[in-house]
Regions:
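Acidic, turn-prone loop/beta-hairpin segments
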Residues: 32-59, 91-178
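ATP/adenylate-binding site constellation spanning eukaryotic-like Ser/Thr protein kinases
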Residues: 82
């Protein structure tokens, strides 16, 4: 195995990006609990889109784990955090999170999506970032309500309930304009 300062720096940067994504999500769920969830049908379209994207990511990462392609799993998670979350979704929803009333439908819709993202992403990183995922799990009361540890939780669940067919081609055209 080859190791160099460049590889270690790149790995550190990937870890930092993933960790900071979780920090942002956790910071915006501090006043949110499961009673505040919005039904998927009533969510803002952008929030539906990101849920659909994380479900697609989940399938891809699980397939990578099943074929022992851990590098592909890491790359997929990192690219999702950088491109879909950092590059699009989180940048757009900041205004809603910071300016809307605490109990507004728009803010709760976003927080519902962030809660789903947290739940899915933490399970996806657990095989590769075990200490980080467990630390996040222990800090989040809504996750502790499910199980005592991320490693005792079901890896994939509830996709049938929340997955709706989203026209991803339409969203790609919108993001190209951006």
């Amino acid at each position: 195995m080859v190791a160099s300062d460049e590889i270690l720096k790149r790995t550190s940067d990937q870890y930092r990006r993933i960790r900071n994504t979780f920090r942002f999500i956790l910071g915006n769920l501090n006043d949110f609990n499961s009673n505040d969830r919005i039904n998927h049908e009533n969510q803002v379209e952008l929030d539906k889109w990101i849920i659909d994207e994380v479900i697609n990511l989940e399938k891809k990462v699980i397939n990578s784990y099943e074929t022992y392609s851990y590098h592909k799993a890491v790359q997929s998670i990192h690219n999702f955090c950088v491109n879909e979350l950092g590059g699009i979704y989180l940048d757009i929803v900041k205004d809603r999170l910071y300016t809307c009333k605490n109990n507004s439908i728009a803010r709760r819709s976003c927080q519902t999506s962030l809660d789903i993202l947290l739940n899915k992403l933490i399970k996806l990183i657990s095989p590769i970032l075990s200490y980080t995922s467990e630390e996040i799990w222990q800090l989040c009361p809504s996750l502790l309500e499910q199980e005592d540890s991320v490693f005792l939780s079901n890896f994939s669940d509830n996709n049938e309930k929340i997955s709706m067919k989203i026209d991803s081609g339409e969203w790609k055209r919108i993001f190209e304009i951006k």
